[in-house]
Amino acid sequence: MSSQNLNDNPKNTSSAAEDKKKQTSSLKLAPIPTTSPWKSSSPDSNTVIPVEELRDISKTAKPSKNGSGSIKLTSNTKWTPITPSVIISGSKDTNSKSGKNSKNSKTNKKMKKRGKYNNDINKKDFNGQTNSTSEISNVSNLESKPLDANAKVNIHSSSGATANGNIKRITNNNNSTNGRQSRNYQNRNGKTRYNNNSRHSQAANNAISFPNNYQARPEYIPNASHWLNNNSRNSYKQLSYFRQQQYYNNINYQQQLQTPYYYSMEPIFKSIESIKNQIEFYFSEENLKTDEFLRSKFKKANDGFIPMSLIGKFYRMVNLSLGGDPNLILASMREVLQHKETNHLEIALGSIEGAQKNMADDFNPLENYFIRRENWAEYAMESNFDENDDETEKYNIEKLLGPNDLDNYSYMGYPNFFPSNENGKKSQSYDQGEISRQFEQNLQIND
């Protein structure tokens, strides 16, 4: 049985290969589909549309430029355009514009009438110049004469009505005309004489008394007649304004002379006070504990004195002294000596050995002054006690200065250096101009 199965196996394999060949030869390509599988399977889809109709459809399918978003209608009805009429609800009249125009025309007519009326009045006024001048002169004579008790009745009865009528006429004419016309008209008719006389009489009667038995002269106000004719109240206010202004200026005249002196001295006071405080700070215990530079300058050969010319070159001293003005530093040194008991500082007068004498322009007055602290030895370094040190500069100290030795540099100018008599009393006849000149020499401020 086993041998038969072995013989049958090759036959079976050959038959299977033949069947596969037959299957492969029977397969063919499918035909091209005539209809799209994604479209509906309606009988109309199989109809063929000619090319000419497709071209017509593409032309009609293009949207129009004007009506791209409009709705297309398939019916055969025709539509005609409509012209809409806008209707606004409200109570406004349709003839509002015409009403405004009519109002404007009315105002224009009124302005023309006023202009004609003013021109007529001006013509009448210029024609009747002689009458107006005579009437005004009568009124001025009536007011200038003193009125008795019996004469008052006659004036009011006979000429009062005419005078009042003339004054009313004048005021009405002035109010109707322009400012320039009224001024010219007043000058031609001689009204300025009447108004100036009344104004001078009022100013003379109303003279203002000032302090120190001074009376102000009445001021002249140009074109005052225009104000007096138009409105008496305005003229009174104008006169009072000028009088008050003169009174104000006369009282404050002395104060204006004093205030510049006060304000010009204020920065000097602040500068001197700040320099004094800065010098006291340099030689204070708090600063000397940390300031090794100043401690190195306390030499035993110079008895601990430091030249003020060196202190004046410090950055803060230059700024506080308004650019390094030595006069301000000398004035602050005087203040330091005035507070000697509290700051424990000493200032001496002397010179530097071997120093060249500078020209007058280059001379620094601080080179002749030296400063130290009373207990300077406590803060001096060990190397400063060598007296044979040739590198250190040596100072020739002449004397220690007292609180009154620097009075010539006082910021007040003349506190304690008045010239005295033989009895030691201060002279009362000291020239104030000399004092001011000395003060300007001592305090030359850098502008």
Curated annotation (Swiss-Prot):
Q: List the residue ranges of the region (Disordered).
A: 1-143, 157-198
* Bias-annotated ranges (Low complexity): 89-105, 164-184
Its GO CC terms?
cytoplasm; cytoplasmic stress granule; cytosol
Spell out the Basic residues composition-biased ranges: 106-116
Gene Ontology BP, a term? intracellular copper ion homeostasis
- Top-rank taxon of the source lineage equals Eukaryota
Q: Does the keyword RNA-binding apply?
A: yes
* Keyword set, alphabetical order: Copper, RNA-binding
The further comment given in this record reads:
Present with 861 molecules/cell in log phase SD medium.
Protein name per the record:
Protein SLF1
Q: In which organism is this protein found?
A: Saccharomyces cerevisiae (strain ATCC 204508 / S288c)
Q: What is the organism lineage in this UniProt record?
A: Eukaryota, Fungi, Dikarya, Ascomycota, Saccharomycotina
